UniProtKB/Swiss-Prot annotation:
Sialidase inhibitor. Competitively inhibits bacterial sialidases, but not viral sialidases. Does not inhibit glycosidases or proteases. Has no antitumor activity. The presence of a 'disulfide through disulfide knot' structurally defines this protein as a knottin. Disulfide bonds join 2-18, 9-25, 17-35. It comes from Asteropus simplex (Marine sponge). This is Asteropin-A. The keyword Ubl conjugation does not apply.
Amino acid sequence: YCGLFGDLCTLDGTLACCIALELECIPLNDFVGICL
């Protein structure tokens, strides 16, 4: 599974965004971010 647009992600990569959709994990704090 990979995170879709608007999904949460973790900065350590355990919850990653879909690279194939060119989504990046934009940090919200020191631990989590959002796929945009």
